[in-house]
UniProtKB/Swiss-Prot annotation:
Ni(2+) binds at H99, H101, E105, H144. GO terms for biological process: L-methionine salvage from methylthioadenosine; L-methionine salvage from S-adenosylmethionine; methionine metabolic process. Its cofactor is Fe(2+); Ni(2+). Keywords: Amino-acid biosynthesis, Dioxygenase, Iron, Metal-binding, Methionine biosynthesis, Nickel, Oxidoreductase. The gene is mtnD. Belongs to the acireductone dioxygenase (ARD) family. This is Acireductone dioxygenase. The record marks D104 as: May play a role in transmitting local conformational changes.
Length: 170
């Protein structure tokens, strides 16, 4: 279950109902998908082959199709980041630049952890700390950035409005 940390006051929201309510009020789509159907050989595997990535997409194809039909998404892929990722530190520096997009930024966490820092409607930032099974859609034009948690590894399905993917506006 995702958790929220509000930057300015350094408070946390950990209760499932309160997390969902907070995100809904901020216009952030949050869903919990069944991660238990992921086979053992893909669980916590951060060195994925193209075949592994295709298998992950097939496993969650119904969920991807459902959210895509509801929200108009047209493309998806799988990304894996870990200590074995070339230039991981450089990538993270780039990811941590505050930006927005003219479309939603959608991620489903398959393994590992990630954090979206999002500017709230009140202009203050909050973190959404994500774990396996969490799907988040950062709304279009919301200022945000993405980073990893202390384990510095994540496998995520990215879902896009267009086949070109997201274009960051800094």
């Amino acid at each position: 279950m995702a958790q929220i940390r509000i930057h300015e006051v350094n408070t946390r929201i950990e209760n499932e109902v309160e997390v969902s309510k907070f995100l809904q009020e901020e216009g952030v789509l949050y869903e919990k998908w069944n991660i238990s159907k992921l086979p053992t050989h893909l669980n916590e595997n951060y060195s994925l082959t193209d075949e592994n990535k295709a298998e992950i997409l097939a496993i969650f194809s119904k969920e991807i199709a459902d959210v895509s039909a509801r929200r108009g998404y047209k493309a998806h892929d799988v990304i894996s980041l870990s200590s074995s990722t070339p230039n991981l530190d450089e990538l993270l520096i780039n990811f941590q630049k505050e930006h927005h997009h003219t479309d939603d930024e959608v991620r489903f966490i398959v393994s590992g952890h990630g954090i979206f820092a999002i500017e709230g409607k009140d202009g203050k930032f909050f973190d959404v700390e994500l774990e396996p099974g969490d799907l988040i859609s950062v709304p279009e034009n919301a200022r945000h950035y993405f980073t990893l948690q202390d384990d510095r590894q994540v496998v995520a399905i990215r879902i896009f409005v267009t086949t070109e993917g997201w274009v960051p506006i800094y």
